[in-house]
């Protein structure tokens, strides 16, 4: 990797020219195809040229149309990674060869020149001018020297920064080639660099680099050398002016899902504004990516936290890959701000963010747009468009997708760059220019403002929807609102005026002017408008003729109008009479016998106005016409006036208020009309005074029969004569004789017997008035009362009850009556209801209920009620079936009566209707479809079976108001919780122009409104329709091969099972769906020539049809290739057959030879299998014998167990508090004045100060668990001086901790993880309090320990791994058949020949094990800590023939350098030691030879470790009993099938049972003692502890079960488990790996006894739980009983508690080390002083006690000056 930073000699401005729009809209996509793979591209600063670097070539394109400007070839060149840049110096026999040039760096220099660095010549660079002519060519290595290596670069402040990861070590350059190197623009000389160690170079892959504020950042992914470790994403940072990279720092970036799943693989990253946006995936091949947004402020703070953590002396620098991993120095008193550049670390605090959105695609690049949108390029030729959520600025939501490129460009979106209102997209073999937004598709301001595209805004000057960069004026946030029509909206011809538009939110003209256009813009005149705050005003043009046209308001640079209105130009001269002139809508005036828009002189104040006629005139009559008129006094009586009607003229006589015209013959033009109107003009000479309309009528057209004629108004003078109605009849109406009445028809024909039916009777001459027929109508003998009457031809009446059928009889007339009788009969019937379905429905109503009955179509009125509410009838299918829609119900489960009303009949259904719960929708899967719909989706919810049908649709908005934008798709209800639906089709009129939308879903389920709009909760993604390319001619296909179909958008919203492909009428089953490809497996033989329905088609070939959803696509005809081979291939086949025969003969010979070899190998394997069987049989027999004989310890061995002696209490406290630390000396104590310690100790007397220390540690997430444990030990050690005060502090802290845990809903985790300072303090305090009361339990534990030790030593123990034949831990079970025997040897201790010790050992024991046993046997009466270490003596074998032989683990003759690893440790059998041999102990003498023999070559002392029974031998270098390269399957991975293991590891599991049976009694005794089964009293502190937990559980409302978990965790998990796993705390015994394994099993068993959950045991359960499962089942109830006994025991009195605390105070007074602990605690407080001071100041109580000031006095005491804070950082010049 290489970081380069260099100052240019000639500083030039780096400001880019303002982006120019390359071309106007209208072109959706432009593509440049490259012959070679494109490495990178960049745009020139003037935005006119695009430079593209492909393999061996650089090309410049015109930005307007992507046409080629210039092109230059840069490769291939003669190069080799094993040669120098000039190729003159190569390593050994290497020579330069033809090598392709891959461009790694492509940058525009400040001078405008093009910088290109390739993968050849060690990554050197060249510069080109704008015409791609070579300017300079340097040899300095800059870029990565491999095509596959990563290189990122940027130019910042005239400096080039490069990060590169070379993959080839080249001797031709500096072997310490930095990963980053910045060159001067002229000579490319590097200035500063930081290096990666060679071991780490291949781990880093650089993704991008960017700058923010005064920092430079590089994003890299790190793949650990160990495959078990996860891939991480590192953010590297250093200051811009940091030439020595002192500020070089790293943090880890993590992106996690909602379930806290970590997505480790970074796929793309981009930085914009104050956000760092990155895309991650769960695996490199995952098709789902999660996008996380990191705040740059959080990035800065995370770097600062890590730097500050190192500043306080915590942890190390952790930059081992660049050679910086020293320990951090504590300099907390030195200030450090967030922008500091004086320290760099690779801290352990990572930056974690949760995923903001999941993208269902493999994201390969990201691009941010104006901090409004984010574009994600994918590997499948798509750009996913995302926008920031309006409610949450850190949340993203998808609003569209774009297909990019074509088949020739490749499918992966490598890089995206904004280019004006377009995107430049780099694909593997092409550059694509695509529109940035969809704004051009929105034509109105309102549509633009509500667009889902966040980049779209309304540009007022151009009146178009566009992006902000394309608008020359201000963007509109509020659309203009036009208030009414323009004023005026009409003008007179030949006049001009100012027209005003009342428009709100109209911005003032800036950079443009407003114009008014009269008529269409292409054929219109325009005038400049004047803008005011209230609107716009325009002067109008002169118009010469009346017309109506459109007036538009536009801007001078717009093509679209702001508003359009109809505008009228009128001409008053068109009105010929005074009255029409004065009454016109245009305000015309009558001036001097003509109409004008305005009068120069006084206009007429009144006009003659003829009033409409009140009485019409009969057509064909000749009579005078009298008309009323107004303002007749204005007429000149001397002038002759006359009337003119239909061309006939008659003189007119003018009265004061009327006009009488002479007789005129009035003839109608069309006598078929009953009424007509003709104009009548009053003339004065040739001048028309006024015009009135005269109404004419025709009697024959007004009445067709006698009764109607005689019923006409007497004023019409119509009479009946000559069988017609006429005004010429001279007979009176009284003497007229009419025809008899007649009934033509009636309806309905039947009705209920209860009556009430309204019958309408139609006929002729049914009376002249209602009185002629009132009370004279009978229907089948029942009276019928009139409800409606029309003269002569219609009577409506309501019939009374009836029981039979009969005609309708009507008597017409008063004096003399005529009777009319119908020919058809009316029937009285009985209406009945048999059943109804369904009889249940949702509470919201709308259920379509069908009623079945008889005579349901009878009667005139029918209605249905459900529960007393109307059930609107939908339709009546017949006399037996009707349907209605139920109303909403009042309550769920209520039964409602169903009643049918037919006129006066009322019928109730026997079964009631039941209202049930409304259906609800919970989820839909899948939530994606295409525009044509028809995809099957599953809908889950509840109460679906309460409705009979459901239909699915999409709506425009999740909130009202909204509209349905799709058709209604049917659903199939399967049960109450599941139904399947077809996705709906988007309506063509509503089809959005964007290719992708997310629309809310709604369902039509009766009248249930809750599912009509599911809102934002459930939205369906609508994608473009999948399309398939038709065949070009007939498609030829091999039947046995899969059929591959090409198309677009195939898998966006469809799965393989959504496609139905037919070849003819046979199915072709889909096996794979890609975005552009569909693969199916079809019939092997060619089907019949049909379509998918089996309909025959023309020709011999079947039709290929694809059905997906509602889409049906015919792709064309397909023809299967003929299976008969063509004749021209016969010779080829013959040759192939001959070649096959020869090949078979050769193969047979080879097979015969191989068969002989396999038989030999088989016999060998058979022999190995027999050996394996013998070994297994032998092991089983031995295991059976051990199980039957070794069930208890022998009496002899039992007698060897000595009485236990607990270590003294001070030593126990020291072991408990400082088991993992060494507090024997503290450098800080020597530097700390006693007065300072006294002042600090005084501070500890304030509870608030201690509580603040604990709070500071608990709230600091950077403090590790081990640091918290150390802090707890320091506090306990210091507080032990006053044990009562210590107890009070611990109890108060515990109470507060319990309350916080309950409040945080973590009550069940109390004492479980012990990651809290409070819990650690409490466990240590509890152990100290109970130590003196644990003598019975410790006795049982000691016997158990000795029993386990004896059982383990009975068999072989591996000195390297600690595996033992006899153990109760499966992990440390020796899975080998080790042949050994017991030897009795004699030991002469240290030249005491007269005293010998007898010892039993194993012949397989290593020498270090023998020494340990010798020391234990000789010094068995001496405590272990006082015995000599095995490094202090040697053993010599007394041999008369060979002399004394010194025993060592490794022979002095064979060293590590001479032996093949691993080396076997020597055993007693290797030295030939026999039974009865004598060994002598001698003092160890350290010489060079003995040092070498002691395995010092391994880098560490083996003997000191073995002295503690802790094998330190590396299993890769040494082995004892188990050789890693041979043996069982556990230790060896077979390299060939012929290798058979010597035995099966699982056979040895029976040894666990042997060991368990031996020590089972001791385990039970120990567990029973912990449970106090044999004791009636308990330690007072235990009762005190349990009572505290009971009280706090009651106060905080915690259940009894959780409280018991607290007790079990505190008593067993935190105290007893610590004792069991660490016997060195209480006994003076050695440490042993094999014993640790045994004790871990005992500890696990003890925890299981106190577990409250019943474990589920099986074959896969851990052996530690299976071994003692029965014991655990017996003892678990006793643990609950223990808690009950303690709880029910008498409460602990204050006096008893005080006595106990006094005794404890006396015990702890003998403990030492509190001064050292006080000094270390002061050092910790000093390192966290700022945080503690802030907490003290924020607390009112501690502030009143002046604790912040007191602490400040202590912290400001001067200490000796340490080294410089950055002394651990190595600078690289």
From Swiss-Prot:
Q: Which residues lie on this side of the membrane: Cytoplasmic?
A: 1152-1764
Q: Give GO terms for biological process.
A: motor neuron axon guidance; negative regulation of cell adhesion; positive regulation of axonogenesis; regulation of cell migration; regulation of cell shape; semaphorin-plexin signaling pathway; sensory neuron axon guidance; synapse assembly
Q: Tell me, in one coarse class, where this protein mainly resides.
A: membrane
CDD domains recorded for this chain? IPT_plexin_repeat1, IPT_plexin_repeat2, RasGAP_plexin, Sema_plexin_like
Q: Which SUPFAM superfamilies match?
A: E set domains, GTPase activation domain, GAP, Plexin repeat, Sema domain
Recall the GO molecular function terms of this protein's record: semaphorin receptor activity
As for subcellular location, the record says: Cell membrane
InterPro entries referenced in this protein's UniProt entry, alphabetically: Ig-like_fold, Ig_E-set, IPT_dom, Plexin, Plexin_cytoplasmic_RasGAP_dom, Plexin_RBD, Plexin_repeat, PSI
- Residues forming the PSI domain are 438-480, 571-608, 698-739
The record's listing under SMART domains reads: IPT, PSI, Sema
The segment(s) forming the Sema domain are 20-436
Is the Cytoplasm keyword given for this protein? no
Q: What does this protein do?
A: Involved as a receptor for mab-20/sema-2a in the formation or stabilization of cell-cell contacts at several stages of epithelial morphogenesis. In early embryonic development, required for proper ventral closure of the epidermis. During male tail morphogenesis, involved in precursor cell sorting and in the formation of distinct sensory rays. Involved in axon guidance of SDQL neurons during neurogenesis.
Under the subunit heading, UniProt states: Interacts with mab-20.
Can you name this protein? Answer: Plexin-2
- Gene name of the encoded protein: plx-2
